[in-house]
Amino acid sequence: MAARRDIFLQLVDVASECYPDVEARQIAEMIILAKGRISRNDLLIEPNVELEIPEFETICDELRSWRPVQYIVGKADFADMELTVREGVLIPRPETEELVDWVAREAKEGARILDVCTGSGCIAIALRRMVPSSEVWAMDISPEALAIARENGAEYAPDVRFVEGDALVDFSAQFKGVMFDAIVSNPPYIPESDRALMRPNVTEYEPDIALFVEDSDPLIFYRAIAQTGRKMLNDDGHLYFEIYESLVEEMVAMLEHEGYTEVTVKEDFRGKPRMICARVSSIAR
């Protein structure tokens, strides 16, 4: 037992061994709120109330070994939701919320939307909640990721339809002729050579299958989805991707080569080009 504030400060000290101060404080807060089952107001208003976290030492060891805080607490914030996450599924990122906002702003009421490489289901579930009367499907190759996505769907958007499928092959037959107004994807896109630039909390814990692609063809997922997307998008349907900032020119050229038009690139909140949208052309079908 120790005062809430003392536990919080101990967690900050431990997290600071791996992370910058601001991030360490955010991590410490996430842990004490989740594991202590208290609110932020509880921590601020009554910092001296005693609290017990039985697994405290284990949590500290996990932090020192770079285990992501989202896996430690089993949750990740996304949009207005607190999604379940575990090893085996990519942790949702704030940049992806911006992609969701873009799709939601442009989607019409009742739109049919497909999320490819859904992971935790964050994109599909958020879009179902944000686009009135929408019909949303979500696909992933990983049974483990789909199990987590279905858990999240059951809690936040029970009518999202989850399908197991491989984005690298023509997956149109699995949807039995259903046509979509929008296809959105945050596929693997980080070149393997950039692995060394990333922190251990990503490279040692999050699934490689959701992150990395071979240097020889970093657009492999984008191209495959764009090619299948031509068959599955309604006239004037749109394809949306989260992208790697170093691949923008290649992405624009690839989409235009595949027959898409009105290719638009957007920057994220950090000013980096991280999202792209293109309209399908009936001529390209």
PLM segments and residue spans:
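Non-catalytic accessory regions of SAM-dependent methyltransferases
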Residues: 1-48
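Conserved AdoMet
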Residues: 30-105
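Conserved beta-strand segments of alpha/beta enzyme cores
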Residues: 82, 135, 159-161, 261-264
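Flexible, glycine-/basic-rich loop-and-beta segments that form/coincide
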Residues: 282-285
